[in-house]
């Protein structure tokens, strides 16, 4: 059986869910780390809703709430995305993912550091590329939306 690359996405809101969905469709094993009481503007397209409902669905992809990181292989084997309540990101240490993507969109860094994985990416303001994370992605509407920032801030 082929070993898939594991990635962690911090945050399961609507924008994060777009990233999660795309990574899943590209064949990555994605673990979503969510807070205890997530909020999202577009709740029907947010994997974070699994925290409340046990499951969430975004374009026919299922997110499933788990209570322990040891449940990940079973959920991945079912073709689903595990959602774990782990606001502090403690499970990053034990899972050792290839990349950590911070998609919390808190407009400030809530603890993501470059030493969490070989590749770290953050969405939106509050991060400095090459200091806090490797890359920052611009999330503000306009001509620079989606731009990858290699040095500096969004």
Predicted feature residues:
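Well-ordered secondary-structure scaffolds
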Residues: 2-154
């Amino acid at each position: 059986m082929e070993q898939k690359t594991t990635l962690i996405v911090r945050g399961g809101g609507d924008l994060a869910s777009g990233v999660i969905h795309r990574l899943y469709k590209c064949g990555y094993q994605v673990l979503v780390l969510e807070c205890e009481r997530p909020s999202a503007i577009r709740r029907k397209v947010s994997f974070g809703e699994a925290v409340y409902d046990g499951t969430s669905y975004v374009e026919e992809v299922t997110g499933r709430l788990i209570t322990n990181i040891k449940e990940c292989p079973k959920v991945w084997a079912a073709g689903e995305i595990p959602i774990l309540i782990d606001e502090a990101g403690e499970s990053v240490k034990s899972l050792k993912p290839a990349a950590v993507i911070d998609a919390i969109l808190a407009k400030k860094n809530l603890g993501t550091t470059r030493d969490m994985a070989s590749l770290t990416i953050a969405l939106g303001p509050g991060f400095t590329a090459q200091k806090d994370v490797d890359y920052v992605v611009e999330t503000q509407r306009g001509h620079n939306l989606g731009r990858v920032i290699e040095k500096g801030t969004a």
